[in-house]
Curated annotation (Swiss-Prot):
The chain crosses the membrane at residues 26-46, 55-75, 100-120, 134-154, 197-217, 238-258, 272-292. The keyword Membrane applies. Pfam families: 7tm_4 (PF13853). Glycans are attached at N5, N265. It is a multi-pass membrane protein. Residues 1-25, 76-99, 155-196, 259-271 are extracellular. Keywords: Cell membrane, Disulfide bond, G-protein coupled receptor, Glycoprotein, Membrane, Olfaction, Receptor, Sensory transduction, Transducer, Transmembrane, Transmembrane helix. Residues 47-54, 121-133, 218-237, 293-319 are cytoplasmic. This is Olfactory receptor 8U3. Potential odorant receptor.
């Protein structure tokens, strides 16, 4: 791509989810509530996993990083989105837009591969339980988390640099509630054909690689479960993977709908609704999915709440 690093646009205007005045206040309250639940849920999950020694296992190590990623990419999008409901003209500076796009891509791609790492962890736990502690050593776990972070950062940096080296010399209204690649390309007066190919290629590669790991892991897991003769053993194995399967289905289903459909079928309004789901709703759902279906997390949460309540009682009595 031979575009010169010159832009006639110093800021963008985010159109937001809706421009209907009667929906602004209800939407603000709804998304504020969702964001608060997201922050409390993910932060709470991270804290509980860190402080409870019973949860210092590979599965919860990955889960704490998933909660961190959900918290980060929701925070990169939701606060700015809510501004659109309380101001008439929601502007974002050129460089802030680049930063938001970079953060969003980094954490979204990281989540793809973290879910794959978690699927591999479940595969080892069910298919090779006797070798679990060796195969999922601390060093291996750190590598399975570090690689997604480093890879996603490099890919996000690459895409962000290319997108913001394009020339923006005309309209600056982004038909979206955050800075995303496709809506930005619609505003560029440069040739965006190569960039569109790169988006499709990288999105396809990331989803095919990560989903292949997930799918292969679960095929082996299902085969192992079918070989278990006792009903109780099968239930225990299924409960171990149930939460992760739900989270994977929701996340990948939304991304496939968003990025791997033909260009002729793309509607920015439809994409906007899909984006709301995976940038706002999924980060809220994940801690609920993993905690409500997990006895160990529920027990640890109850223990932490009881301990906090006892501490408050002691503080009150000491006054």
């Amino acid at each position: 791509m031979a575009e010169v690093n010159i832009s006639y646009v110093s800021e963008f205007i985010l159109k937001g989810i809706t421009d209907r005045p009667e929906l602004q206040a209800p939407c603000f309250v709804m998304f504020l509530t969702i964001y608060l639940v997201t922050v409390l849920g993910n932060l709470g999950l991270i804290v509980i996993i860190r402080v409870d020694s019973r949860l210092h296992t590979p599965m919860y190590f990955f889960l704490s990083h998933l909660a961190f990623v959900d918290l980060c990419y929701s925070s990169a999008i939701t606060p700015k989105m809510m501004v659109n409901f309380v101001v008439e003209r929601n502007t974002i500076p050129f460089h802030a837009c680049a930063t938001q796009l970079g953060c969003f891509l980094t954490f979204m791609i990281t989540e793809c591969f973290l879910l794959a790492s978690m699927a591999y962890d479940r595969y080892v736990a069910i298919c090779s339980p006797l070798h679990y502690s060796t195969l999922m050593s601390k060093r291996v776990c750190i590598q399975l988390v570090a690689v997604p972070y480093v890879y996603s950062f490099l890919v996000a940096l690459f895409h962000t640099i290319i997108t913001f080296r394009l020339t923006y010399c005309g309209p600056n209204v982004i038909n979206h509630f955050y800075c995303d690649d496709l809506p930005l390309l619609a505003l560029s007066c440069s040739d965006t054909h190569m960039k569109e190919i790169l988006i499709f290629a990288f999105a396809g590669f990331d989803m095919i690689c990560s989903s292949s790991i997930v799918l292969t892991s679960y095929l082996f897991i299902i085969a192992a479960i079918l070989r278990i003769r006792s009903t109780q053993g099968r239930r225990k194995a299924i409960s171990t993977c149930g939460s992760h399967m739900v989270a994977v289905t929701i996340f990948y289903g939304t991304l496939i709908f968003m990025y791997l459909q033909p260009k002729s079928n793309h509607s920015l309004d439809t994409d906007k609704m899909a984006s709301v789901f995976y940038t706002v709703v999924i980060p809220m759902l994940n801690p609920l999915i993993y905690s409500l279906r997990n006895k160990e997390v529920k027990d640890a949460s109850k223990k932490a709440l009881d301990k906090g309540y006892e501490t408050l009682k002691i503080l009150r009595l000491s006054k």
